[in-house]
From Swiss-Prot:
GO terms for cellular component: extrinsic component of mitochondrial inner membrane; mitochondrion. This is Ubiquinone biosynthesis protein COQ4, mitochondrial. Zn(2+) binds at residues 168-169, 172, 184. It catalyses: a 4-hydroxy-3-methoxy-5-(all-trans-polyprenyl)benzoate + H(+) = a 2-methoxy-6-(all-trans-polyprenyl)phenol + CO2. It comes from Phaeosphaeria nodorum (strain SN15 / ATCC MYA-4574 / FGSC 10173).
Amino acid sequence: MAKRVCVGDLRKLAGSVSTPSRCILPPHARCFSVLNRPPPNYEGHIPLTVIERLGLAVGSGLGSFLDPRRADLIASFGEATAQPHFIYKLRDRMLLNPTGRRILRDRPRLTSTSLDIPRLRQLPPNTLGYVYALWLDREGVSPDTRATVQYIDDEECAYVMQRYRECHDFYHALVGLPVFREGEVALKAFEFANTGLPMTGLAVFSAFTLKKAEWRRFWDIYGPWATRNGAQSDDVINIYWEEELETDIDQLRTRLGIEKPPDLREMRKAEREAQKKDKEAKETMTRAAV
């Protein structure tokens, strides 16, 4: 005899059968999408999917290659390509160094206020602090213009990227390279050999956009200098710049194993003067021949 089934039993039976086409997620699970992002890991953090990170890397990389003056694109490309491997490796190198560990623990920030730029201008002429302040004044730049890190997922690694970014002007002052393109390419080559960050490597490729004379100087002088010194010197990310401001800059270079390259501004000036004299000589010969 068939068993009688009431309507309530049918409803219970239907509710106990899962529908194959639907995937039931745990209550705490969240889909990662542009419209439904997981919470940020720190203030200002913007999580990215793999596709978004790839798009950011390609777009900002091409843009910064075509226009190296776009600091925002350079910063975005640096963050998009630094993880998952390179920024962690740089962080690990800091953890292996006593000074690097102190920097990670203290988390200092390099700003015009924290550095007290007016005080640095009063230091003895050959100190790092004085040379740094003089370099800022000559190049017309400020330590307060560095963008805040947004796309690095790990909070500690985000600080490492921020620290690298804020230390960039100290690298300029330490080796005496200016901020125009030729100087930036040389410094980025030094940074690539020292830090291994992909963004610095891409910047080296912009050497192909240099003028003929600039390319010749980079190939003959500044490229070899950058590769040699970046590879052989101490990790510049592990320098506690705030504690070296009153250090003699020549002694600091010696301690770090960094040779100061030829003065790029003086070389460019000498080349312009030579071109001017050559032009005047040709004009004189032309007038004499007439």
